[in-house]
Amino acid sequence: MYINMDIKYRDRNEIIAQILESANGNPVRLTKIMYEVYLSHGLTKEYVRLLIEKGLMEYLDGERTFKTTDKGMNFLRIHNKVQELTT
């Protein structure tokens, strides 16, 4: 039996950062986020709902898309800086 030791497990902050990054710039649909971040539909919805509640993402109702807010961009900057300092 072969076990792939290259698999990197992501913590919650890493998943959040990847979601915010995928919705950075142009508004995107939930499916695009799901495929870019490699999450199930249910988990993607849970994370996106949390990010909207915390003000890190916004839902554009007329377009049915999501976009990273300024607060979300600030989270990304801080997260990336911490990653840079710890690796």
List the predicted regions and their residue ranges:
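Short alpha-helical segments that sit at the start of domains
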Residues: M1-A17, L43
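Short acidic, hydrophobic short linear motifs in intrinsically disordered regions
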Residues: P27-V37
